[in-house]
């Protein structure tokens, strides 16, 4: 019987792995023509064909308004009509950083994804008397990643580039580059 399980929670939020992160990354590197064009080309070739959400299909989503959040349901008139009791508290991001991408990631870590995921995981694992650990949420790792400039979060068209580089020697490419 298993006593401990390792979770991947926090990896996308700490290392930058979501679709909207890619669009914010393009915004972050917009003044570095080479880096911008390289990422945009890879994004169009490898990522865009897999995106079903119409809000994430525009690579310049944040160029006109860096506070754009129409993809979040309580800002979206189309989606609001499906709720019987729309939320009264409109989603507002807290300000942590002048970097659009870092600010988004920090909101996900402290208020959005991570608290919800870890709570659900803890309940599910406790149901089976298994201890859940989330190594990507290690405080020192988190603090280190806060010192890394956003331009290093993605490279060669890959999200979570730093994480992929770290595990290069230990994980086969067919898993690492998936």
Spans of model-derived segments:
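Short Ser/Thr-interspersed hydrophobic loop/turn segments at strand-loop and sheet-helix junctions
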Residues: 109-123, 145
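ATP-dependent adenylate-handling active sites, centered on carboxylate activation for C-N bond formation
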Residues: 1-90, 123-170
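Short, flexible segments with low predicted structural confidence
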Residues: 96-98, 112-117, 139
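Residue-level recognition of hydrophobic positions within alpha-helical transmembrane segments
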Residues: 9, 104, 117-118, 134
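PAPS-dependent sulfotransferase catalytic core
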Residues: 171-178
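Structural motif
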Residues: 95-109
């Amino acid at each position: 019987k298993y006593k401990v399980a390792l979770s991947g929670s926090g990896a996308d939020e700490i290392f930058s792995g979501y679709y909207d992160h890619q669009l914010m990354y393009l915004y972050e590197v917009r003044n570095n023509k080479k880096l911008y064009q390289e990422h945009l080309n890879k994004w169009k070739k490898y990522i865009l064909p897999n995106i079903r959400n119409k809000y994430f299909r525009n690579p310049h989503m944040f160029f006109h308004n860096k506070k754009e959040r129409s993809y979040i349901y309580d800002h979206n008139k189309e989606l609001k009509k499906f709720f019987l009791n729309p939320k009264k508290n409109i989603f507002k991001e807290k300000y942590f950083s002048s970097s659009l991408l870092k600010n988004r990631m920090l909101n996900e870590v402290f208020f959005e994804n991570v608290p919800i995921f870890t709570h659900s995981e803890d309940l599910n694992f406790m149901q089976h008397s298994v201890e859940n650990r989330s190594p990507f949420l290690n405080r020192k790792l988190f603090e280190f990643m806060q010192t890394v400039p956003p331009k290093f979060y993605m490279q060669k068209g890959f999200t979570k580039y730093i994480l992929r580089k770290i595990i290069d020697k230990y994980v086969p490419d067919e898993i690492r580059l998936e």
